Curated annotation (Swiss-Prot):
Needed co-factor(s): FAD
Family matches, as InterPro entries: FAD-dep_OxRdtase (IPR006076), FAD/NAD-bd_sf (IPR036188)
Protein name (Swiss-Prot/TrEMBL): L-2-hydroxyglutarate dehydrogenase
Similarity comment: family membership: Belongs to the L2HGDH family.
Length: 388
């Protein structure tokens, strides 16, 4: 049986970052991707925002990896000529009753190490964005946008330069764990299906990470978290936008609210909303997601957007695209932290599961990759125990 030093399952932005990290550490690395191209799921269907790190509980993985990852990502974009823009973001209170929540958000961001936040009055916010309606706002200058496809191309390029190989049309079919021998036996599908043993495996399968974990014979099912999928639709603005910064309402249950984001060409889009899908079951066949945008959802978008942009014209929104967020808690539950589950948690040398890697996963991809590679390699297990 062929042996491979490291395998990454999933070629989204986090999986590619993990493969890059492992390959740059000198490990022979193979990336298994079930689709015919990299980054076709969550990594390609999001807001493409570089988050500052405002929203997450102090000392959570989301907070620490977002703040560290944001700095790493801006530097990576600069050195790899990836299109990006540090355009800034306004989080708005649209009534006096919301202003205490805005103050709490500023306090949370500062506790997380976001040191450039500015509280603005309504007049100060409108001086920056005249079309905005709010009673107060929080300016986050370090928030930005990035070409996610260009980012993934650069990550893959670095990984391949360091010796990694990407295997497309190669879904993981099954695996097995043997506590008595090192390594994890994996079997991949596709025309060139393989059976091999890997010393290090990072499960970066995103939406399907629980299914991948369930396919590993011998892995305790009790350690596989619940799996929920939250669909989010986006609508594009017809015509020019009057805004030069991102505009976010205060966060809501399940997401960050229907916000205004910009692409690198200056076109505006709005989203995502939250539509909970039927729960996928670990161990069951993967059903392909339905990414169609329901035009009937537009009415709710107009209502949400007009809270902070009352002048949004009628018939200005057109369906754009939808994405699906992997979650490990369901409707009504507080947002969960990233779950980076390594040998310190499950006792299986070399195996790391990445569960619930939703936003800010893109921002944090390089920091997540370092953490996951440390756990898979075992070189910094003490640090992982202390901070993971």
């Amino acid at each position: 049986m062929e042996s491979i030093e490291a395998v990454v399952i999933g070629a989204g932005v986090v999986g590619l970052a993990c493969a890059r990290e492992l390959a740059r550490r000198g490990f022979e690395t193979v990336i298994l991707e079930r689709h015919g191209a990299f980054g076709t799921e969550t990594s390609a269907r999001n807001s493409e925002v570089i988050h500052a790190g405002l929203y997450y509980p102090t000392d959570s993985l989301k907070a620490r990896l977002c703040v560290a990852g944001r700095q790493q990502l801006y530097a990576f974009c600069a050195t790899h000529a990836i299109s990006h823009q540090r355009c800034g973001k306004l989080v708005v209170a649209t009534s006096p009753a919301q202003e205490s929540r805005l103050a709490a958000l500023q306090k949370q961001g500062e506790a997380n190490g976001v040191d450039d936040l500015q509280r603005l009055s309504a007049a100060e916010a409108r001086a920056l964005e005249p079309g905005l309606a709010c009673t107060a706002a929080l300016l986050s200058p370090s928030t930005g946008i990035v070409d996610s496809h260009g980012l993934m191309l650069a990550l893959l390029g670095d990984a391949e330069t360091a010796g990694a190989a990407l295997a497309l049309h190669s879904p993981l079919l099954r695996g097995s764990l043997d506590a008595n021998t090192p390594g994890i036996v994996l079997e991949s599908g596709g025309a060139d299906g393989l059976r091999f043993k890997a010393r290090r495996v990072i499960n970066a399968a995103g939406l399907w990470a629980p299914q991948v974990a369930a396919s590993l014979a011998g892995f305790p099912r009790t350690l596989i978290p619940a799996n929920f999928h939250a669909k989010g639709s986006y609508y594009a603005l017809t015509g020019r936008t009057p805004f030069s910064r991102l505009v976010y309402p205060l966060p809501e249950a399940g997401g960050l609210g229907v916000h205004l984001t910009l692409d690198l060409g200056g076109q505006a889009r709005f989203g995502p909303d939250v539509e909970w899908l039927p729960d996928p079951t670990p161990g069951q066949p993967i059903d392909e997601p339905d990414y169609r945008v329901d035009p009937a959802r537009a009415d709710a978008f107009y209502a949400e957007i007009r809270r902070y942009w009352p002048a949004l014209p009628d018939a200005a929104l057109t369906p754009a695209y939808a994405g699906i967020r992997p979650k490990i808690v369901g409707p009504g539950a507080p947002a969960a932290d990233f779950l980076i589950q390594g040998p310190a948690q499950h006792g299986i040398a070399g195996l790391v599961n990445l569960f619930g890697i939703e936003s800010p996963g893109l921002t944090a991809c390089l920091a997540i990759a370092e953490r996951a590679a440390d756990a898979a390699d075992g070189t910094r297990e003490r640090q992982f125990r202390a901070h993971g």
